[in-house]
């Protein structure tokens, strides 16, 4: 691990990423930028440190509140992040000796906030190191209020936990929180090759492969693997996609040789799944950066029937097609295990803002479907405002549209709820997803 002065570059990158998040940056973008100069091993180390710290932030703050005189409100937010990173190294990274976790955190605090901050960091982290056996989350003193206790132990915002408990109860909500705090596996989708062939290539390259939940042709890989260094990646023989996203396209069950519009398409996994069946997939996104990344994958996969279009989903100039998939921008509450920053960024008011945008996109998407054609609305949210409520409102306002369940066997019965796709992390062991098929009348 390369040192940045007396501090390793990986730790500097981790602290800088948390600074970026406070400024409003997204985790994926910040990690890509801050870890650009690190080798693959240090990048994985930095990612584990940052993701793990975010997943346990509430627990760490409870620990710090009892050990920082005057509480966390009296110290700088950046110093709080340095302490959080130090705690994660002490309690959860066995590869890091305690003296290194403490010394590096102290030096980082000194460099960024002066000698007083470094002394505080040294005292707090040394005390935590001495008391580590009593600091397991299961042993922490919890609030008497059941929701407060669950939110603290599961390290999620209280308002979200309260919503989920009202919907699913305490036991299932606890399972969801635990799922969100685990590392999401990497799942590969074969492209232009069958699963057995790709599995053989990966195992020959020393990659451990396992089966995936709910899919018989996905490959779940474990261990620190640099995908871009694999020959199968360079040959365009797979792309990365969680089973929940794959289930959305299987649920869609578009007719062979259809012309399909995939609105809000980046990063592109659903477009590539649709391309297996469709004659043409018109993949739309308004972000030039996201489209450029998707363009690179189109080239790598040689997906010749995928055409990219830069457009706002609310205002497109496209003509009517056989089918439209609306993978609507959403709060992403079904993907918190992949995006641990999102739980702390989300506000209850965001639900109304997001739903308003979704209504506009859904209305515009419906205009792109020919008479008799198919409209599929999907999200990676768990929230009813973005899912059932959205679809029910649309169907009530547009009598020419009807809900149409998928063909028998398109997806496992376990993920169907009254003909709608409903994938839940705590029940199915994958990301969350929701989708509904709607058919337009012929005239």
Give the residues covered by each predicted segment.
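S-adenosylmethionine
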Residues: 1-443
């Amino acid at each position: 691990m390369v040192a940045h002065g007396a501090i390793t570059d990986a730790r500097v990158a981790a602290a800088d990423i948390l600074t970026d998040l406070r400024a409003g940056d997204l985790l994926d973008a910040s990690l890509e930028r801050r870890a650009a100069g690190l080798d693959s091993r240090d990048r994985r180390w930095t990612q584990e440190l940052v993701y793990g710290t975010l997943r346990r932030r509430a627990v760490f703050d409870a620990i710090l509140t009892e050990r920082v005189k005057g509480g966390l409100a009296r110290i700088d937010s950046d110093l709080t992040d340095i302490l959080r990173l130090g705690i994660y190294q002490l309690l959860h990274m066995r590869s890091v000796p305690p003296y290194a976790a403490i010394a590096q955190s102290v030096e980082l605090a000194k460099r960024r906030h002066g000698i007083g901050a470094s002394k505080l960091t040294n005292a707090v982290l040394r005390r935590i190191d001495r008391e580590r056996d009593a600091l397991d989350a299961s042993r922490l003193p919890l609030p008497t209020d059941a929701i407060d206790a669950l939110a603290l132990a599961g390290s999620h915002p209280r308002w979200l936990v309260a919503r989920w408990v009202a919907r699913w109860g305490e036991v299932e909500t606890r399972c969801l929180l635990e799922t969100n705090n685990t590392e999401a596996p990497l799942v590969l989708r074969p492209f232009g090759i069958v699963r057995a062939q790709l599995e053989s290539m990966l195992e020959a390259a020393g990659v451990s492969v396992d089966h995936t939940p709910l899919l018989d042709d996905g490959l779940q890989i474990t261990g620190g693997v640099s995908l871009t260094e694999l020959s199968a990646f360079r040959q365009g023989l797979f792309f990365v996609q969680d089973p929940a996203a794959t289930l959305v396209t299987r649920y869609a069950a578009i007719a062979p040789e259809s012309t399909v519009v995939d609105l809000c398409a980046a990063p592109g996994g659903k477009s590539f799944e649709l391309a297996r069946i469709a004659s043409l997939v018109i993949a739309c996104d308004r972000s030039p950066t996201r489209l450029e990344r998707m363009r690179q994958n189109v080239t790598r996969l040689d997906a010749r029937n995928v055409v990219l279009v830069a457009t706002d989903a609310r205002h497109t100039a496209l003509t009517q097609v056989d089918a439209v998939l609306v993978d609507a921008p959403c709060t992403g509450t079904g993907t918190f295990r992949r995006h641990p920053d999102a739980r702390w960024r989300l506000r209850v008011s965001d639900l109304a803002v997001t739903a308003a945008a979704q209504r506009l996109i859904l209305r515009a998407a419906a205009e792109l479907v020919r008479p008799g054609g198919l409209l599929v609305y999907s999200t990676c949210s768990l929230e009813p405002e973005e899912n059932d409520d959205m679809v029910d409102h649309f169907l009530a306002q547009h009598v020419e549209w009807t809900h149409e369940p998928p063909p028998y066997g398109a997806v496992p019965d376990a993920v169907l709820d009254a003909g709608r796709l409903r994938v839940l992390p705590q029940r199915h062991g994958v990301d969350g997803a929701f989708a509904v098929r709607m058919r337009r009348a012929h005239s």
